[in-house]
């Protein structure tokens, strides 16, 4: 089966492209029925139609007209593929013919440009930590200034700065730069805050009235109106004046600043498109939201501290930021969190702020690095029509025919609990209990793992030519950056087959399945012990092989997997070793960052993160992919490693010696110079569109940064097993892929089928 075609046309990839016909059979398949879906995938030739979709009037349905619906031109009616209700066709569909078929009856993915108006342009509230060093702050100010040119002219912008206190800047006066100052150690509530800023008590919701000197929305004004004053204030920012005592950290009120930002937007722009863009240069040292004590003698928590219950502030801080995340999500807003320091800032505690709202989490060493500067500006990337690719206020619904129920979703979203949908499963995977989710923001790369359950407990006979299909429809309503409301609709049909049908096994997409299992594992790792998650992965792999491998009992050498299953075990091997599950040598903030990126990317990029790609360059042959194995490291080759998070060029021992000798500068050795350039050119291509920008590492045999390559390799030759002369020895206690496969085969063949 060509799984890539479905992804190219519809942005969807299923683990199983043919479904079992009963719940029991589905459970025996081990890998859940699920798919990876990219709502705003950039589809070549996507049709955008300039009218509203036709919606089914069936009770609790609201599915949209699609190519799988039955059309009856005689009665001018259509039958919904999801609920089978008959609906009246609007008058514009009454003259259907082979030459006059609407796009939505031809294409399985269609985008509607609806007539619903957008009341308020997008809002960008910049929240800037000023406790950082002057050079770091200056670099940040330059990046923010550069980003203003990428925003729509009518965008509303605001500014909050914070250190020990929180400062809310007021640009409503043309001549005076005003600022409201709040205590950094106070947990403000909505009503008192509104009264403080407007002089009036809050009665119900505040309408988006005209801006006045006393209205709450005076803190958000059009970019085209205040850009000059905004930049003036930005440029005048200096390091926080509160002195830092020796042996102490700066006083930093991140929690209070975020709280005030969220309340301010809630007060005047609830359920309108808004981003809170936070730039932090260290951990919160003031309650509410305190991450670490003021005294430097008390180090910030590690994974070991969290696991052993010694992270004294961790649970309280996480509870505070989770509450903030729920409120911001409910208000329809987004949080982006950018870190620019060597220290941790508390991303582990604050991660739900971005994960529940569709925001960006970025970990960098400084605001002056290329990784921050380019990644931050790529957030505002534009399409060919010069509109920002980011979208706002998204609502994602999954409709399914009676054969299926929705178990849940794993990705950057929040559940809509109040729903009349009837296709919700009793069992939950990820964010469940609903078939509708919200995202304050959507980017084209945002991809969601959606899981399904077979509704029928008993077997449904599927025989003869009467092919039974299960239908799924993904509906994404969102605000486009052009100022329009759009609806992206994708409808797919999957065949149902009885237990034991060879079509089910043939329909297995091992790449999509590996990513779906990985998403579940990462989701489990948030609440379960690491070894328990590893055991779950191992049990899943063993059960799948027991079900679909060919073997003779008690004979490991007879073990065989079909081609579309053969790579799945090695994906699981590299998943077990990945930084998503193996947190040794990573800080909690790094783990939060890695997991955040992993749970938003598509199948291809996710696989690169699980099992990085390795390309070999040599004088004797063309560049070629090689095994991610210590045996691939040779003295006369250059290796290019792509882990998604960093791209590394490794020069073998001989190549490194030639380079140091300067052979590339001698015209006689033009071929060698070309060899050195080849991996750089390929690396540059990988860097062009990736978000966030990966770290680039250039190293050689014996170099200190060669460890970044060696840590990713399968240790075919370790200090425990030094068989191959001339091979690179990897100093690790990790089991090799070969031994892992032997253990797997033994576990499978020694267990009763």
Swiss-Prot record:
GO terms for biological process: COPII-coated vesicle cargo loading; intracellular protein transport. It is a peripheral membrane protein. It comes from the Eukaryota. Zn(2+) binds at residues 56, 61, 80, 83. GO terms for molecular function: GTPase activator activity; zinc ion binding. It is found in: Cytoplasm; Cytoplasmic vesicle, COPII-coated vesicle membrane; Endoplasmic reticulum membrane; Golgi apparatus membrane. Pfam families: Gelsolin (PF00626), Sec23_BS (PF08033), Sec23_helical (PF04815), Sec23_trunk (PF04811), zf-Sec23_Sec24 (PF04810). GO terms for cellular component: COPII vesicle coat; endoplasmic reticulum exit site; endoplasmic reticulum membrane; Golgi membrane. Its main location: cytoplasm. Coiled coil: none annotated. Keywords: Cytoplasm, Cytoplasmic vesicle, Endoplasmic reticulum, ER-Golgi transport, Golgi apparatus, Membrane, Metal-binding, Protein transport, Transport, Zinc. Belongs to the SEC23/SEC24 family. SEC23 subfamily. Component of the coat protein complex II (COPII) which promotes the formation of transport vesicles from the endoplasmic reticulum (ER). The coat has two main functions, the physical deformation of the endoplasmic reticulum membrane into vesicles and the selection of cargo molecules. The COPII coat is composed of at least 5 proteins: the SEC23/24 complex, the SEC13/31 complex, and the protein SAR1. This is Protein transport protein SEC23-1. It comes from Candida glabrata (strain ATCC 2001 / BCRC 20586 / JCM 3761 / NBRC 0622 / NRRL Y-65 / CBS 138). The gene is SEC231.
